[in-house]
Structures are given as structure tokens and as C-alpha cells.
């Protein structure tokens, strides 16, 4: 069956919870299509002022809890953040021992989840251009393409020297701007 996603009704800074739910369902549908038959508990999505996160602690009904910092009516930040956090869920993040960050390998999961965000932004931009779930999201296709271009140019700029430490220093403002 379809993955159940519940979005908190309030706190989205002008974003409509029903529209946000439609966006998140599109993200989940795209990524879950790569994991046929993968069962998942329902997901509850809330707004956070701290950082986007897939929480280790389940909700009272056993639901997976994801917090996003995205707000407002633009779909791009929701696609980007939810893709990243949902990727953590799909990569069995909850199996880390005592939910400790696995320092030696966490970078790989983070890189994979960034790729998932870029992939989903690109894929939804293309599919919404042809057949969006709503008129508002048809208009958002261009904005998603712009988000992809911004992220890709920031990545290229960050690696301009070819030195990993420089890349991290150059990427820090971009990561902070996108909630990391």
C-alpha cells in the first residue's frame, strides 16, 4: 500500500500543510520506487527551528518522525530536506548501535543522502513539468530546476581548488543555507 505521511497542520511559515503533504508524498513515491516492496511505518513530519533530522525515537504510535526546517510556500526546500532525511530512513539509520553516529562511515550516508536530494529535485522538476499533482506544483517545476542549478554550481565552486579542506570550507555556507 501507499506510505502514510502526516504533516503537522501548523508552523510552516505560510506553507500549506496539505500542499506540503503532496510534495512529501511525491518525494517518498519517487525514492520508494527504487525499493519495491519496502515496508515502512507511517511518517509524521513536523517543523523544527534547529536542523532537519530523522529522529531515532519513534512517535507514540510507532511512527517514524522527521523534522524539517523548510517553511513558506516554495516546494524546493521541502523536496530537498525531506529527500535527504527520507534517504536516512531508507538506509536503516535506526540500526546504528545505540543510535550513535558512526563517525568512520557517516560521511558516506550523508553523501548518499545529498545525492538523493539532488536526484529527487531533478526528477520532480521534470515530471512536474509534464504532469504535476496540482497547478501550484506545475508552477514549482521551474523553481526546482533553479534549486538544482544553485546546488550544483555551489558544489562545483566548493571543489574549485581540488583540496578537500578547501571544499569543506567553501561548502559550509551552502550547507548552512540548506539546513545542515
Language-model regions, residue ranges each:
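Short pre-active-site segment immediately N-terminal to the catalytic Zn-binding motif
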Residues: 65-82, 96-105
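Pan-zinc metallopeptidase signature
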Residues: 154-180
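Auxiliary, metal-adjacent structural segments of Zn-dependent hydrolase domains
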Residues: 2-73
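Intrinsic-disorder-associated interaction segments
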Residues: 13, 17-20, 24, 133, ...
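Post-HExxH zinc-binding segment in Zn-dependent metallohydrolases
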Residues: 103-155
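Hydrophobic (often cysteine-bearing) scaffold residues that line and stabilize catalytic clefts
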Residues: 20, 24, 79, 105, ...
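Active-site recognition of the HExxH zinc-binding catalytic motif
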Residues: 79-97, 110, 114, 118
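Sec-exported extracytoplasmic/periplasmic mature domains
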Residues: 29-36, 91, 95, 117-126
Amino acid at each position: 500500500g501507499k506510505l502514510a505521511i502526516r504533516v503537522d497542520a501548523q508552523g510552516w511559515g505560510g506553507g500549506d500543510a496539505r500542499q506540503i503533504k503532496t510534495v512529501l508524498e511525491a518525494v517518498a513515491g519517487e525514492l520508494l520506487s527504487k525499493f519495491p516492496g519496502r515496508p515502512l511505518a507511517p511518517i509524521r513530519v513536523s517543523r523544527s527551528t534547529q536542523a532537519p533530522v530523522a529522529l531515532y525515537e519513534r512517535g507514540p504510535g510507532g511512527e517514524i518522525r522527521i523534522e524539517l526546517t523548510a517553511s513558506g510556500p516554495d516546494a524546493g526546500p521541502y523536496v530537498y530536506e525531506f529527500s535527504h532525511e527520507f534517504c536516512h530512513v531508507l538506509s536503516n539509520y535506526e540500526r546504528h548501535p545505540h543510535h550513535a553516529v558512526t563517525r568512520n562511515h557517516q560521511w558516506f550516508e550523508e553523501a548518499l543522502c545529498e545525492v538523493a536530494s539532488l536526484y529527487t529535485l531533478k526528477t520532480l522538476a521534470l515530471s512536474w513539468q509534464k504532469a504535476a499533482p496540482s497547478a501550484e506544483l506545475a508552477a514549482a517545476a521551474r523553481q526546482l530546476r533553479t534549486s538544482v542549478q544553485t546546488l550544483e554550481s555551489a558544489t562545483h565552486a566548493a571543489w574549485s581548488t581540488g583540496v578537500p579542506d578547501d571544499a569543506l570550507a567553501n561548502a559550509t555556507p551552502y550547507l548552512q543555507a540548506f539546513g545542515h
